[in-house]
Protein backbone atom coordinates (compact mmCIF):
# COMPACT_ATOMS: atom_id res chain seq x y z
CA UNK A 1 0.00 0.00 0.00
CA UNK A 2 1.05 3.60 -0.50
CA UNK A 3 1.21 6.39 2.12
CA UNK A 4 -2.02 7.71 0.60
CA UNK A 5 -3.89 5.70 3.25
CA UNK A 6 -1.97 6.96 6.29
CA UNK A 7 -2.02 10.49 4.91
CA UNK A 8 -5.81 10.49 4.45
CA UNK A 9 -6.37 8.72 7.78
CA UNK A 10 -4.08 11.18 9.59
CA UNK A 11 -6.27 12.31 12.58
CA UNK A 12 -4.17 15.46 12.99
Swiss-Prot record:
This is Unknown protein 1. It comes from Solanum lycopersicum (Tomato). The lineage of its organism: Eukaryota, Viridiplantae, Streptophyta, Embryophyta, Tracheophyta.
